């Protein structure tokens, strides 16, 4: 499973403070810790920026700063094309855009960048017009529409990470099964495509969140989820991923599990 580290997000209080003060050491240490925890991508979100020009300047500072200390690709987390392109111009390696959705105008804005820079992209199974669909069938239809537009731009399906959308159980008890149904549908209908989720959304507003997150992770792994946006410094969660991949036949000869044990990464 690919792990997208979620912690470099300026809407988080401590990160926002460090960012405003241009505390390079804090940001770089956060990047290092996530890399050491097992992240394969680092999400970078400049959510404090009110304007596109300001956000572009933020990414111009963040991208080189982070890639100076970790040899990982970044997931450029923004809804605006100008800041995204600023980040992509500075990025070393194959980046990921977070995100596009099923809105036609948004797809026509983002997919040219995906093609131009040869990057990956997270695709939300929603649209700005209709919001988040209430059924797996509607979400699958949006995923298929996105795949059609991607084909027009000759974006490989394997570079698209569809997000079936995790919504909290606290507002609707069926949200977990809805996500899993959509996930299975994407793997069946768009087999070459990847899938991703913002894992911790499932437990928002509920007690013992880590317990729910771990259980949900195993269910999603069993349905074929390829990547997750999560906290890679959460040792218990990362240990659960190692165990889950071994049990589900995704770790040949349990090599990664044994390696994690030898490195002390299962002692959560």
Provide a role label for each language-model segment.
Residues 1-17, 25-28, 37, 230-268:
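Extended, intrinsically disordered, low-complexity segments
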Residues 35-72, 166-176:
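Glycine-rich, proline-tolerant flexible connector loops at the mouths of alpha/beta enzymes
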Residues 116-263:
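Catalytic alpha/beta core domains of metabolic enzymes, predominantly
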Residues 3-29, 53-54, 98-102, 130-137, ...:
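Active-site mouth loops of central-metabolism enzymes
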Residues 43-46, 72-80, 95-105, 125, ...:
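Catalytic beta/alpha-barrel core
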